Amino acid sequence: MRRLSKRQILLLHDQLLSQSGGSPGLRDDGLLESALNAPFQSFGDTDAYPSLPQKAARLCYGLVKNHPFVDGNKRIGAHAMLVFLTINGTELVYT
């Protein structure tokens, strides 16, 4: 399973802000790291979020809830979730 790196998230965030406006800046690096790692938590041999959709949802939730950026946290959460699903082979159909 492919993960989004911190660098990729920062680039996606910059792209979103350039397209939709907002204040740039990372508010808390630790909260960003936490949001990126949370979907891949495990306890013993058991994944906390075993399926791709669960991991994607947890990534979105972490970025929104942790609020690591100055602005655009909900936007990056939703966008990162969709990019994560796409790079892991999920075909997204918008109707």
Set out the residue ranges of the language-model regions:
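FIC/Doc superfamily catalytic core
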Residues: 1-95
